[in-house]
């Protein structure tokens, strides 16, 4: 019983430390409109081109784009830190 509890605690701490795997930058502040006034595609949602995606408010720290998601067949919008190797 004790090893099972330890394993569950380890898994819980791992999820808390590493975060949810499908975040895609949705919690990073971003603009909800494109320059032409149309709504943009939010991070984590399907897209076909980068110009459809919402841009980050802090463009110097964060980058955005439309790319293929890991374990998903379609392209999605993402926002991530420019210095992150996970982007």
UniProtKB/Swiss-Prot annotation:
Protein name in the entry: Toxin ICK-42
Disulfide bonds: 40-54, 40-77, 53-66, 80-87
Locations listed in the record: Secreted
Domain notes: The presence of a 'disulfide through disulfide knot' structurally defines this protein as a knottin.
GO MF terms held by the record: ion channel regulator activity; toxin activity
Segments traversing the membrane: none
Tissue expression profile of the protein: Expressed by the venom gland.
Taxonomic source organism: Trittame loki (Brush-footed trapdoor spider)
Entry keyword set: Disulfide bond, Ion channel impairing toxin, Knottin, Neurotoxin, Secreted, Signal, Toxin
Entries under Pfam families matching the protein: Cys_Knot_tox
Signal peptide from the UniProt entry: 1-19
Free-text function comment from the UniProt entry: Probable neurotoxin with ion channel impairing activity.
InterPro entries assigned to the protein according to its UniProt record, in alphabetical order: Cys_Knot_tox (IPR035311)
GO cellular component, as recorded: extracellular region
Family statement drawn from the similarity comment of this UniProt entry: Belongs to the neurotoxin 27 (Jztx-72) family. ICK-41 subfamily.
């Amino acid at each position: 019983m004790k090893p099972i509890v330890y394993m569950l605690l380890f898994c819980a701490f791992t999820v808390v430390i590493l975060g949810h795997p499908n975040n895609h930058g949705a919690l990073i502040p971003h603009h909800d409109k494109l320059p032409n006034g149309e709504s943009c595609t939010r991070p984590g949602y399907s897209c076909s081109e980068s110009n459809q995606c919402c841009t980050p408010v802090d463009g110097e720290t964060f980058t955005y784009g439309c790319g293929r998601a890991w374990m998903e067949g379609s392209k999605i919008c993402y926002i991530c830190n420019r210095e992150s190797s996970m982007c």
